[in-house]
Design a protein with these regions (language model features):
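Early extracytoplasmic/lumenal segment of secretory-pathway proteins
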Residues: 35-103
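Conserved C-terminal helix/tail region of periplasmic/extracytoplasmic solute-binding proteins
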Residues: 349-388
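Short helix-loop capping/hinge motifs at secondary-structure junctions, enriched
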Residues: 162-170, 204-209, 298-304
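A structural signal for short loop-to-beta-strand junctions that line the ligand-binding cleft
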Residues: 88-93, 111-157
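N-terminal secretory signal peptides
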Residues: 1-11, 20, 32-33
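Ligand-binding pocket segment of bilobal, Venus flytrap-like solute-binding proteins
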Residues: 102, 187-190, 194-199, 207-274
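Short loop->beta-strand "edge-of-pocket" segments that line small-molecule binding or catalytic clefts
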Residues: 174-191, 205-206
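Mature extracytoplasmic/periplasmic domains
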Residues: 290-358
Length: 388
């Protein structure tokens, strides 16, 4: 959900005429044979985890089906692929919380679920997901747009042998404003999350339009933060550097990035959510919730909804939580039959002890209105720093 590469999102909030034409062309060019019933075929566009053989193989075997899943690390890229004609390819799309409600449903890229059939699953989830759950519903509150599963806080990660949890929570984003910390931290490559984090370091809410003064502050902060980084890399690079003592903390990060190191026996690698920050109500952290929706494919596979039901089952939900690559809490842990499957070590890996507390200190992932402008500024700062 968080290790993203540099992707252009110019005019992301506006559906272009070219993309609309591509959708129409894609449907027109679809071979006649491909329009046959797809009761043994399922295609999933998702974040890492749902593409795991651990998750897919039992479903393949049970249904005698060909199930293909492609994992990406960027929500807008997935959505733009639907816009560009792949609405005719995919059956399910798995992205972070705002996109179904704010973008994909209004653009008719996804179709509503049978609320009577699917909403009862929410009653077995953790209390925060009590139905009707905002991010799973359309603006009217009438249509169920997707199902929830993985979630978690995502601000930054520290090595508590170097920076205590208490210090990190109290200082929060100001860790990056202390000149003494230059070259003591890393930056996890993740375009959208790093834009969020740099806004927080600069002292303002990411999820609003920003005035000229804030943009100038963002520019200065991005240049300073990238110049002061010891390294920029992926999750594996960050965890290796933290464990080796090469860095003390990294931006951005959370359960999704820290859990593999913790599961490998490094409890000192810890997700941190600041106690205060620049978001509404003084909140200091940011959290994410995945929503999986059925694509508005004219030949949607009947297996799409069956797969959504499959991953709601306690045993499957536990597998999803600990699918290879990254480990995360799941909403289904509200069901005692699911929760009992988690070992003490697994609960520790996902920092269950402080999960609820940290979620309450976090604002939920949302869309940045002037994201393109800020991303261009941040990318320039990154290039400038790498050039020396």
């Amino acid at each position: 959900m968080a290790n993203a590469s540099r992707i252009s999102r110019r005019n992301f909030m506006q559906r272009s005429a070219a993309m609309a034409a591509a959708v129409a062309a894609g449907a027109a060019l679809r071979p006649a044979g491909a329009l046959a019933a797809r009761d043994k075929e399922l295609n999933i566009l998702c974040w890492e985890g749902y593409n795991s053989a651990q998750v897919l193989d039992p479903f393949r075997a049970a249904k005698g089906a060909t199930v293909k899943a492609e994992s990406l690390t960027n929500d807008p890229t997935m959505i733009n692929r639907l816009r560009a004609g792949e609405i005719n390819v995919w059956d399910l799309i798995n992205v972070n919380n705002p996109w179904a409600r704010k973008i994909m449903a209004p653009e008719k890229l996804i179709r509503p679920l049978d609320r009577a059939r699917m909403e009862p699953y929410f009653t077995k989830m953790l209390p925060a997901f009590k139905p009707p759950y905002k991010w799973a519903m359309d603006d009217s509150g009438q249509q169920l747009l997707g199902m929830c599963q993985r979630f978690g806080p995502y601000s930054f990660v520290v090595n508590t042998n170097k920076v205590s949890r208490a210090t990190a929570e109290d200082q929060g984003w100001n860790l990056w404003n202390d000149p003494a910390n230059a070259k003591k931290y890393g930056i996890l490559e993740s375009d959208d999350w790093n834009v969020f984090g740099i806004c927080c370091i600069a002292g303002f809410d990411p999820f609003k339009s920003h005035d000229a003064g804030e943009v100038a502050k963002f520019t200065e902060t991005a240049e300073r933060v990238f110049k002061g980084a010891k390294l920029v890399g992926d999750i594996a690079a960050m965890n290796q550097a933290l464990v080796a003592g090469e860095i003390d903390f990294h931006l951005t990060g959370g359960t999704y990035s820290a859990s593999p190191a913790r599961a490998d026996g490094h409890p000192e690698i810890r997700r941190v959510t600041p106690k205060k920050g620049p978001m509404r109500d003084g909140l200091g952290g940011i959290s994410w919730i995945e929503v999986t929706s059925t694509v508005n494919n004219p030949q949607l596979s009947p297996l799409a909804v069956e797969f959504l039901e499959y991953v709601q089952q306690p045993k499957t939900a536990h597998v999803v939580a600990f699918a290879e690559g990254t480990f995360n809490p799941v909403a289904q842990m509200g069901n005692p039959e699911c929760f009992k499957l988690f070992t003490k070590e697994e609960l520790d890996a996902i920092q269950w002890d402080s999960l609820e507390e940290e979620m309450t200190r976090s604002i939920e992932y949302d869309i940045v209105p002037d994201y393109d402008k800020l991303l261009d500024i941040m990318s320039a700062a990154k290039r400038q720093a790498s050039a020396g």
